[in-house]
Amino acid sequence: MIKKIGVLTSGGDAPGMNAAIRGVVRSALTEGLEVMGIYDGYLGLYEDRMVQLDRYSVSDMINRGGTFLGSARFPEFRDENIRAVAIENLKKRGIDALVVIGGDGSYMGAMRLTEMGFPCIGLPGTIDNDIKGTDYTIGFFTALSTVVEAIDRLRDTSSSHQRISVVEVMGRYCGDLTLAAAIAGGCEFVVVPEVEFSREDLVNEIKAGIAKGKKHAIVAITEHMCDVDELAHFIEKETGRETRATVLGHIQRGGSPVPYDRILASRMGAYAIELLLAGYGGRCVGIQNEQLVHHDIIDAIENMKRPFKGDWLDCAKKLY
């Protein structure tokens, strides 16, 4: 029977993580459980850095970006001996189950702990929206708002100078954030990792737009696809139009979470406690068609496929 749980945030931070922690803590306390917060993700778990959390520990947290528990990347957690120390620390504290908030690397750690017999529930916290088994991740919509605001500002100056702007958006190997920002920001062109990319084809599309009378343009591109400064130079050379690159960077991870992320994080945090009390372990939470769902965390990591939002790309192209 579960009497005490632990909660940690791991990997890259995302707006709404604090709201998720709050959802976990207050739901657990309502059910009569104790909650331990673990500092700095799996690193803090290994180093046994924990704190008892009460309902006041998460007061005024729902609107705060980042994660007050902190986060850290800890690749050493792949080592089974390191994980064994972590489990010993959990048991020493009387913790019966663990809620992990983070991305796919965080899920991998939760999966390994599950395989070693310690029950974990994973919540998807990443701006990249690249987690299997869920339509959206905690932090995605806040990051989208940040990116669109930046695109709006760039459009102001691009139109003033009849300039082409290349905007690099986060997402790692998932184009969801770029696609959504391209639609919401009215970008003329979008480049994502799921679709083969050619600089020459992009330039030809830009030239076609210029021939139709377009005076300025925004190109949204997902990070890691190319050097955006070199791409901007190539576009300027081939089109004769002044072109500048903007890397939005880590500003996309910060800021107060938008209402949808606060709601999603709160619902998922509460649902994690429901699952643990129902006897579930080794699960990850998602939202599909606005309904909370849960999947086997091992199956989600190893077997499930994440569909590419091709309809978003089609929409973006129709609106060029």
UniProtKB/Swiss-Prot annotation:
Binding site for ATP: 12, 73-74, 103-106
Cofactor names: Mg(2+)
Main subcellular localisation: cytoplasm
Keywords, alphabetical: Allosteric enzyme, ATP-binding, Cytoplasm, Glycolysis, Kinase, Magnesium, Metal-binding, Nucleotide-binding, Transferase
Biological processes annotated in GO: canonical glycolysis; fructose 1,6-bisphosphate metabolic process; fructose 6-phosphate metabolic process
Function: Catalyzes the phosphorylation of D-fructose 6-phosphate to fructose 1,6-bisphosphate by ATP, the first committing step of glycolysis.
Family assignment from sequence similarity: Belongs to the phosphofructokinase type A (PFKA) family. ATP-dependent PFK group I subfamily. Prokaryotic clade 'B1' sub-subfamily.
Name of the protein this chain belongs to: ATP-dependent 6-phosphofructokinase isozyme 1
